[in-house]
């Protein structure tokens, strides 16, 4: 591998722009369909767009702030010294593959990925498990670096520090490289998007791409007739299953009667009263129109409906 660019004093916008030039570790799980928060559809649109999306949130901020601490705890637990990479690296054999490493292990052909984990996600790390999209990220780093192994140190807030060692598997890396390069040549280069996978974030992206409708335009969807039939079939199945689910809930309520709680092997059930106050918007608009208008705002969205014409 080679250093593509130093990240010391590199503005974040420039750093994000460099990452558009190839496939990074965080792209790997999404391309493989393993990332619950990001899809190949989103990776594609990020790569072809000139827009730099500087997305940040509290979880990402905490992850950055605690990276030093996680690396320190890793060194304490293993006795291995680590150092910052301070660069975007590029595979010389497969130049499409880029990587930002959290840490490199001093004196070894190895690296370290630092993670911070919510206690609500602790089960995903139980019994030696690693979330699949993180494992894909590490395999990507092994593919870029050519190193022998990679460590993952995960701080589960308030619980424990988990450390895993991932050893290079040449067949796994070969398969990963093939899929990443295929994604690039099949989708990014010809600018043909991959199919969305049904996740909420794909819906948000599609709505963002096409915010405004043209009332004078009607699309011919004949080529999607089979998909529309499949959707109708699924909708009918879901409706039937929802009714069956509701019938079971009704039986449980009849058994509980006025009990607030119920138990069964492997289950805890609650049926408790609650009160909430809601604004009567119709009355407010009628009796206090000035106040209603003062605290109202226009929200624009496109309503999507499919009606089956029998």
Outline where the language-model segments fall.
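Accessory terminal regions of nucleic-acid processing enzymes
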Residues: 1-310
